[in-house]
Curated annotation (Swiss-Prot):
Protein name per Swiss-Prot or TrEMBL: N-alpha-acetyltransferase 38, NatC auxiliary subunit
GO molecular function, one term: RNA binding
Cell compartment(s), UniProt: Cytoplasm; Nucleus
This protein's record includes keyword Zinc: no
Keywords of this entry: Cytoplasm, Nucleus
Record Gene3D superfamilies: 2.30.30.100
Nucleus listed as a keyword: yes
Top-level taxon: Eukaryota
Gene from which this protein is expressed: naa38
Coiled coil start-end: none
Domain (Sm): residue spans on this chain: 28-106
Protein source organism: Xenopus tropicalis (Western clawed frog)
Family listed: Belongs to the snRNP Sm proteins family.
Subunit note: Component of the N-terminal acetyltransferase C (NatC) complex.
Length: 113
């Protein structure tokens, strides 16, 4: 079986001979994701919206769950900058994610369980 990389680059299937290097890469990716848990992040989406919230989890399809999420629309000529829309718990489909920015660690950040 050859290596398969999906359109958004998230799911991988390794060949049987790939060995330890794939396992180490998987462990590294898992540790990186675990280090981002409960951190605030901004997700830019393909339609121009931005969501800001606390990273709670992801799945193998690269969908992201944000807690205490707020939605920000891209300002335009007909719609000036508005107040954010409070979403609460939000699921962002992986195929709609353009970029993810993680907020620097803050001392007063809330911890979600």
């Amino acid at each position: 079986m050859a290596a398969v990389l999906e359109e958004n680059g998230c799911s991988r299937q390794s060949s049987p001979g790939a060995g330890d290097s794939d396992a180490e890469a998987g462990d590294t990716a898992r540790h990186k994701l675990e280090s981002l848990l409960n951190r605030n992040m901004r997700i830019e989406m393909t339609d121009g919206r931005s969501l800001i919230g606390c990273f709670l989890c992801t799945d193998r399809d690269c969908n992201v769950i944000l807690g205490s999420a707020q939605e920000f629309l891209r300002p335009s000529d007909s719609f000036p900058v508005r107040e954010p829309r409070v979403l609460g718990l939000a699921m962002v489909p992986g195929h709609h994610i353009v970029s993810i920015q993680v907020e620097l660690e803050s001392v007063t950040s809330p911890q979600y369980i």
